[in-house]
């Protein structure tokens, strides 16, 4: 998907507004697939997870949009800060997922339900972030 994305993004996304439009349209697809995976539980197969991963590609539009939102003088600093934020956020989310699974199991929930709780946390935080994004861009445009 990254190979195709690398080919098509320059054709679709020429500025920040294009990236925001694509993100606005594409991000819900990822959330819908994650909700389906949570609903299916152990019946969700590798095809569902592959679709989830491929649909996450829309989130990669954020980084170039951050770079384009700043002047050339400040673009490098903004991208470095953004990369640090992504790095810290990824580890934080992984840590929280593990804690939720451990807590679920300590309350005698099954391993499957504990994983569902953790993925539900990811869905809720992702949906909250997406709604916050929509609220902010509607104020800007």
Give the ranges of each region predicted by the language model.
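C-terminal transmembrane helical hairpin of 12-TM major facilitator-type secondary transporters
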Residues: 19-62
């Amino acid at each position: 998907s990254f190979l195709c994305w690398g080919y098509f993004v320059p054709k679709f996304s020429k500025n920040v507004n294009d990236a925001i439009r694509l993100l606005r349209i594409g991000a819900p697809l990822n959330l819908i697939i994650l909700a389906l995976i949570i609903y299916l539980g152990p019946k969700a197969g590798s095809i569902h997870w592959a679709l989830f991963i491929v649909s996450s590609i829309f989130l990669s539009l954020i980084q170039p949009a951050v770079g384009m939102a700043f002047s050339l003088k400040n673009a490098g600093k903004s991208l470095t800060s953004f990369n640090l934020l992504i790095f810290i956020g990824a580890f934080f989310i992984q840590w929280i997922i593990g804690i939720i699974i451990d807590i679920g199991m300590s309350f005698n929930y099954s391993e499957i339900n504990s994983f569902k709780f953790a993925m539900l946390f990811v869905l809720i935080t992702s949906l909250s972030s997406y709604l916050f994004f929509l609220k902010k861009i509607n104020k800007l445009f």
